Amino acid sequence: MSNIYALEPHTNAKVILHTTSGDIEIELWGKEAPRATRNFIQLCLEGYYDNTIFHRIVPGFLVQGGDPTGTGQGGESVYEDGFPDEFHSRLRFNRRGLVGVANTGQNDNGSQFFITLDRADELTKRHTLFGRVAGDTLFNVMKMTELEIDENERPLYPPRIKRTEIVINPFDDILPRITEREKRQQKELEKKKMLEEAKKKKAPKKKQLNLLSFGEEAAELEPPSHTVEKTKMKSAYDFMETSAPTPTELIEELKKPVKEESTVISEKKDDAKQEEENKKAEEEERKRKKALEEERKRQKEEEKKKMQENTSESRASAIEKLKQDIRNLSKTSSNTSDELIPKKDKKRSLVELEREKYASQKRKKMKKGDDTDVFNKLMSFQKKLSTAKEDEDAAAAKRDQPPCEIHGIPGCESCRDTTQDAEEDVSDAGWISHKLIFEKDLKGKDLMKRRETVDDYVVIDPRDREAKAKQEEYERKKGIKSSSSSQRRDRMDHDDKRYRTEKRSRSDRHRRSRSRDRYDDRRR
C-alpha cells in the first residue's frame, strides 16, 4: 500500500460528509481533476447533498449516492450540461476508498458520486477519479455494506448525508448559486404550497339533474356517490330503545295548548301498552327458540348414541363372524391335511398373551419381606454345585471320539451338528461339574499393574536413527581418509626406498671408479 500512496499525487482540497453511519473525510485532487472537484465543492456549498441518501450499495464493489431524488436517475452538475471526463495517468481505481463521478456514458457527469470498496480496474478510464477517503473514516464507509439490501442493490434502510462541511477550498472564485438559508426557505415554501394544494382539493360537485327534462331517469341510472354526508352529533336520546321524548319534543309539547293534553296522554298510554305487548311477544319468541335448540341438541345426542351402539354392535358381529370363518377354515384344513403335517396351536392375539403374562406375574408375586424361600433355594443350588463331581464317563467318551477335520480336536463342540440332535437329555447334570478356567494372568493386567519388561516394547527413536546415520557417514569418510593416507604413506616409502637404492648404487659406482683409478695409478 505504501508504494500505491507514493504514486498518487498530493491533494489540495478536503470535504467532510456528516452521515448517519459516521463522518467521511474526502480529500480531493483539485489539480488533476479541476472540473469534478469544483462541481463537488460548489454543490456542497449550496447544500445540494443535504438529506440525500446512498441509494445503491454493492458489497465488495462500491457505495453510490448524491442523487436528491433518491432513485439513481436524478442529479445535475453546476454546469449547464454534464462536464467532460477527466483522466490522469497517476490516478487509477486500484484500491478501496477512492471517490469517482457516476455517469451514464462518456462526458455525461452530474452530481452523483461513488466510493469504491475494493480494487476496480474496470472503472479506470471510464469514470473520473477525483478524491479519496482519508484516515479511519473509511471504516464508516465499510460499515454501510452490513446493511440489508434488496434485489436491486438498494438498501432497505439507506444511510443519509445529514450535512457537508468544506475544510479546504482551493477555488476562491466559487460563488454558490443559492445559499443554504435560501434553500431552506425554498423548501419551506414548497411544503406550504403542497399543503395549500391539498386543502384546495374539493369533493366532486353533484350533477344537477333536476334541471333536465329527463332528470328523474338520469338520477336513477346515476351510481351512488361515495361522499360522506355530514350529520349532526347524536345524543343519548337517539340511541334509546324506548320512545322517550327528546328535549325538543318536550319543548314543543309545552308550547301546545292545554286542550290537547288529554289526547297526548291517551296516545302515550297506547304506546306504552303496545311496547309491553311487543316485549311479551319477544320474550315468548326467545323461549320458543331456546326450547327448539334444546330439542335439537337432545335429538343429536340420541342419534350419536345410537350410531355408537350400532357401530359397536356391527364391529362385534364382524369380529365374531371373522372368528367363525377362521374356525371353519381350521376345521377344513385339519380334515384335509395329512398326518405328516403337524397340528398347529390355536393362535391367540397379542393382547391375550400380555394379559396372561401379567396375570401369572400377579399370581407369583410374593409378600413383602418374605424371601426365606428364595434364600433356601440359593443355598441348595450352591451346595449342589460344590458337591458336583465331573462325569468321567462323558469326558472319556469325548476323548475317545475321533478328532474333527477342521480343528483336529476330539469331541470338538464347534464342529458338532446341533440340528441333527432330535432329542436332548434335559436331565444331564454334566454342566454343573463343568469348570471355566482361563489362562493364568502373568502380567497382572486385570489388577491394572504394569509388570511388562522393557523387552516387550519396541522403542523407535528418530534421534537414534539420525545419530546412527551420522556415525556411519563419519566412519565412511574416516575409512576413505585412512585408505588415502595409507596409500600416500606407501608411495612415500616406495619413493624413499627407490632413492636409497639409487644413492647406494651411485656411491658404489663412485667407489669402484676411485678404486679403479688407484689401481691404474699403482700399475703405472
Swiss-Prot record:
Keyword presence, Lyase: no
Biased composition, class Polar residues, residue ranges: 329-338
GO biological process, one term: protein folding
Cellular compartments annotated: Cytoplasm; Nucleus
Composition-biased stretches (Basic and acidic residues): 252-308, 318-328, 340-359, 461-477, 487-505
CDD domains in the record: cyclophilin_CeCYP16-like
Function of the molecule: PPIases accelerate the folding of proteins. It catalyzes the cis-trans isomerization of proline imidic peptide bonds in oligopeptides. Involved in pre-mRNA splicing.
Entry protein name: Peptidyl-prolyl isomerase cwc27
The organism of origin for this protein: Rhizopus delemar (strain RA 99-880 / ATCC MYA-4621 / FGSC 9543 / NRRL 43880)
Lineage: Eukaryota, Fungi, Fungi incertae sedis, Mucoromycota, Mucoromycotina
